[in-house]
Amino acid sequence: MNYKDFLNELDKKLQEYFEFHKEHINCTIGCSSCCENGDYPLSAIELEYLMQGFMILNSKDKITVQNNIKNIVKGGACPFLIDKKCSVYQYRPIICRVHGLAYLCKDNTVKVPYCAKNGKNYAKAYTDGEITINPIKENLDTTVLLKDFDYGEIRNLIDWINH
């Protein structure tokens, strides 16, 4: 299976997970709080695919992204965010695809999206650092999902850009 086919299968699975937890998911078009401050870790294979998305952007959006890259700071907005929307949505990394879901990690801890603390996803089921519903039982960590690929090194987006 190639990477694009893998992403298509992953997206189908994630769609089912989002549907299963829909009463706890408050993601909406235009809500980009998850993209406005972070480190955005991604693997080499994800970066390569992301850049394919960049290459097909129109000239205006390419210039916007390039300007955003010049101004990128650690913990800042994703440079691919334009007008509160992902300019490379179909090419986004796995961390962006799974963000918003609460899932079980290999050490049996639950990964809860940070927006739960801000009154968004899972906010009604998340109190004092504890989640009161059953999380997705699959570990959705990038390294686990990409285990069948030679995915290369994982770095934060800013580190890939400054490399």
Predicted features, each with a name:
Residues 1-33, 37-163:
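Short loop/turn segments that flank or connect secondary-structure elements
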